[in-house]
Amino acid sequence: MQEIILPDNIKPALEWVNNRILQKVSPERKHGLAQSRFCGALDDWAVANGAGTAVPEWRFQVQPPGEIRRTLVPDVAFLSYERMPQSEQERIALPTIAPDAVVEVLSRDDGSRDVEEKIRVYLAAGTNVVFVVDPDERTVRVCDSDGQSVLGEEDDVAHRSLPGLRFPVRTLFASPPQRSL
């Protein structure tokens, strides 16, 4: 077997992790907030630098060397124009390369084995960095080929593969201010 093909018309999306099908879970508020904030920061950086595309829930077919091609749907993905030109990104609905950067936001239904397997697969398939956001602990784990580190609320999100991207971890978890109407 060389490829696992999953239906792409099912919502929430399906992924192939640890030799089984997993259906993504609709996020709770804190998950959705962290996901949208991270995607917004990454997209603002990508647009300002003409660097590529940052999209939530973008389906990819990834294949680490010597393994089967499988579907993964990161909470946020960034794909550079360097690795896939803009015209190709606009034309292809399902990229068959790993994203440059991935954000996975933990939810209560995520199994740690499954999260670790996704990190392994992304990095083995060519992803430069995987950010694992934990809304309960209010941390961001940064995983790359050199290992991993954990950022707290007082730290900034940044990575050498995304030059110029920098924002405070705490912004991922802060509620918007309430205004009187």
Question: At which residue positions do the language-model features occur?
Answer:
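Gly/Pro/Ser/Thr-rich low-complexity, intrinsically disordered segments predominantly at protein N-termini
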Residues: 1-181
